[in-house]
C-alpha cells in the first residue's frame, strides 16, 4: 500500500485507535474525507453517522485497509498500520450484506476464516501450554456432546410442535375415520417424545459443564506465562519517528518518543507469531461465538434455513471468532425490518459489552447512533461536524447541520432579527430572551432560532408561567395522535412548526391553540456561519 506520508506522530497513550489528519482523494481528484482526526479509547463504541456521501464508509474502509490513505496517519493498538495489509491489521468487519457461504453450514461459515488464515498468537511456555491444551480437550469433548444433544433437542422440539398442531386439528375434525387416523399419529409422536425430559435434563447438565470448563480455561489463560522478548521492530519504528520529529524541528515530540523508546528497549512483551489454529482451537472459538450469540442450535443448518436476524448473528459470529482488536461494522442492520433492527441494536451493544470490544460502527440512522454509541462522530461532505456523547450532541449541537440531523422529529428553525435581547420574526412576532439565557454572549443581528418539538409546551401550563414572553398562537394544520401525545403541525413564519404535546385533551385540525417555548432549551445559530451561539 502506498502512502507518501511517513510517521510523524505517535499514538497517544490513552488511545487504542488513532486517526491523525486523514485525507482521502480519489484518482479523479474528488476528495471524500478531509483532515479526519479522532482518538478512540479501548472498549469504546464509536458511531460514524451522516447522510449518504458524507465519507463515513470511506473512513471505515481506510481503517480496514480496503482503501488507501492519501495522507495522514493511522494507529491501532499503538502500531502504525498505514502500510499494513488488511489481513494483518487484526480487525474484523461486518458488512451490510450477510456475506455467508450458502453451501456451508453455520458451523463451517464461522470456522472458514480460521481454517484458511494464520492468526496472531502469543507463544505459551511449555507447562502452561500443556495445562491449557488439557482443559481445551475436556471442553471440546463437552461441546461435542452438547452439539449432539442440541441436535436431538431441536428434533424433539419439532415433533412437539407437530403434536400440538395435530391436537389442535383433532378438535375441528368431525369425520370419525380421519379423527382415528390422527389419534394414531399423535400416539406415535408420544412414543418418540417419551424421553424429551431426559434430553432436557442432559442439555442443562452439559450447559453447566460448558460454563465450568469455560471458566477454568479463562482462568488458566489469565494466569498463563508466555515467551517474552524486546520488540525490535517497534523500537525501530520509534527510532524513525524520533529522527523524523527532529528533522521537522519538533524537539518536544522527539523527547516524548525517546521516553517511549527507552521503555520499549527495556520492557519485554509476549512473542507473537502468525500460525494456523488447531482443529480443537477452531472448534472452541466457533462454539464460544455461537454460545455468545445464542445460535448453538443452528450450527448444523444452512443459511437458507435461517431468518434475517439469525443470519445477521452468524455474520457477527464470523467477526467474533477472529478475536480481533477492533470490530468494524458498516450498516449491518439496514437489511432488517424495523422490529428486528430494534432487537439487533440491543444485541450488538450487549455483545460489545460482553466481549469488552472496541467497535466502530457506521450508519445513516440517527436512532442507531443515539442508542448505541459511547461517542458519535457526525460527518457531512467528508468533514467532521461534531464529536461527542449522544447527550452532548443532542443538548449542545455544534452547528445548524448537527441540530437538524439529530432528533426526531427534527428541530424547528426560524429566521429572526436580534436586538437588545429581543428576537423579531418575519411576521413581526417578538420574543424577549431572559438575561440568564443570553448570559453576556455576543449575538449578531441576524440569527436562526432552533427549538425542538418537545420543548414547545401548551400556553396555559407551567412553562407558560415561567416564559410568558414566548407564548404564541398557532392554527393547527395536522394533529397526529400517538397515544399519549400529539405531533402538532402548524405554520409559523412561513415554515412548518412541529410541537410534541401531551394528549391531555383532544386537538382538532383548524383549531387555534396557544403554545410557548422553553427558553432555557432553545438554540440560536449565526445565520452566516451556521455555528451554534448557545
Predicted regions, residues:
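The feature captures the beta-strand-to-loop junction immediately N-terminal to the Walker
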Residues: 49-51
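Helix-to-loop junction immediately C-terminal to a conserved catalytic motif
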Residues: 64
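Conserved ABC transporter NBD signature motif
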Residues: 72-80, 127, 196
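Glycine/charge-rich catalytic "coupling/switch" loops of P-loop NTPases
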Residues: 3-4, 426-476, 505-534
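ABC ATPase nucleotide-binding domains
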Residues: 105-117, 269-401
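Conserved coupling/switch loops of ABC nucleotide-binding domains, chiefly the family-specific signature
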Residues: 68-73, 107, 122-128, 381, ...
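Conserved ABC ATPase "signature" region
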Residues: 80, 115-118, 124-147, 187, ...
Amino acid at each position: 500500500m502506498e502512502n507518501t506520508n511517513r510517521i510523524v506522530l505517535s499514538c497517544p497513550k490513552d488511545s487504542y485507535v488513532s486517526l491523525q489528519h486523514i485525507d482521502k482523494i480519489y484518482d479523479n481528484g474528488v476528495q471524500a474525507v478531509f483532515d479526519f482526526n479522532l482518538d478512540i479509547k479501548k472498549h469504546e463504541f464509536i458511531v460514524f453517522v451522516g447522510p449518504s456521501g458524507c465519507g463515513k464508509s470511506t473512513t471505515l474502509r481506510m481503517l480496514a485497509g480496503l482503501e488507501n490513505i492519501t495522507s495522514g496517519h493511522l494507529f491501532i493498538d499503538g502500531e502504525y498500520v498505514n502500510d499494513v495489509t488488511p489481513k494483518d491489521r487484526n480487525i474484523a468487519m461486518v458488512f451490510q450484506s450477510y456475506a455467508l457461504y450458502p453451501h456451508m453450514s453455520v458451523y463451517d461459515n464461522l470456522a472458514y476464516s480460521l481454517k484458511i488464515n494464520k492468526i496472531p498468537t502469543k507463544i505459551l511456555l511449555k507447562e502452561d501450554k500443556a495445562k491449557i491444551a488439557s482443559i481445551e480437550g475436556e471442553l471440546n469433548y463437552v461441546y461435542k456432546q452438547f452439539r449432539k444433544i442440541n441436535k436431538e433437542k431441536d428434533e424433539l422440539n419439532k415433533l412437539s410442535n407437530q403434536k400440538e398442531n395435530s391436537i389442535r386439528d383433532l378438535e375441528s375434525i368431525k369425520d370419525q375415520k380421519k379423527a382415528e387416523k390422527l389419534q394414531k399419529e399423535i400416539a406415535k409422536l408420544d412414543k418418540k417424545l417419551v424421553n424429551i425430559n431426559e434430553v432436557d435434563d442432559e442439555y442443562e447438565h452439559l450447559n453447566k459443564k460448558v460454563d465450568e470448563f469455560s471458566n477454568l480455561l479463562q482462568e488458566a489463560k489469565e494466569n498463563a506465562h508466555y515467551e517474552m522478548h524486546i520488540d525490535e521492530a517497534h523500537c525501530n519504528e520509534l527510532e524513525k519517528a524520533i529522527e523524523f520529529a527532529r528533522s521537522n524541528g519538533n524537539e518536544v515530540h522527539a523527547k516524548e518518543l525517546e521516553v517511549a523508546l527507552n521503555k520499549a528497549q527495556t520492557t519485554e512483551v509476549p512473542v507473537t507469531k502468525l500460525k494456523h489454529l488447531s482443529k480443537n482451537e477452531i472448534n472452541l472459538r466457533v462454539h464460544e461465538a455461537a454460545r455468545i450469540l445464542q445460535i448453538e442450535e443452528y450450527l448444523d443448518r444452512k443459511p437458507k434455513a435461517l431468518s434475517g436476524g439469525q443470519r445477521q448473528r452468524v455474520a457477527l459470529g464470523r467477526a467474533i471468532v477472529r478475536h480481533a482488536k477492533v470490530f468494524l461494522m458498516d450498516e449491518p442492520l439496514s437489511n432488517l425490518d424495523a422490529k428486528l433492527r430494534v432487537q439487533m441494536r440491543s444485541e450488538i451493544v450487549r455483545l460489545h459489552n460482553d466481549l469488552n470490544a472496541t467497535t466502530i460502527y457506521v450508519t445513516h440512522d440517527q436512532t442507531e447512533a443515539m442508542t448505541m454509541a459511547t461517542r458519535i462522530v457526525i460527518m457531512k461532505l467528508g468533514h467532521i461536524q461534531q464529536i461527542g456523547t449522544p447527550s452532548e450532541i443532542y443538548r449542545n449541537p455544534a452547528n445548524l447541520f448537527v441540530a437538524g440531523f439529530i432528533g426526531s422529529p427534527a428541530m424547528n428553525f426560524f429566521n429572526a432579527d436580534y436586538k437588545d435581547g429581543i428576537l423579531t420574526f418575519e411576521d413581526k412576532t417578538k420574543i424577549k430572551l431572559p438575561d440568564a439565557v443570553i448570559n453576556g454572549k455576543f449575538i449578531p443581528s441576524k440569527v436562526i432560532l432552533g427549538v425542538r418539538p418537545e420543548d414547545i409546551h401548551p400556553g396555559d401550563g407551567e412553562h407558560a408561567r415561567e416564559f410568558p414572553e414566548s407564548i404564541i398562537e398557532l392554527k393547527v394544520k395536522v394533529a397526529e395522535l400517538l397515544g399519549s401525545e400529539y405531533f402538532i403541525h402548524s405554520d409559523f413564519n412561513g415554515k412548518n412548526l412541529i410541537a410534541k404535546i401531551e394528549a391531555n385533551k383532544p386537538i382538532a385540525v383548524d383549531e387555534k391553540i396557544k403554545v410557548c417555548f422553553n427558553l432555557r432549551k432553545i438554540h440560536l445559530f449565526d445565520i452566516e456561519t451556521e455555528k451554534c451561539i448557545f
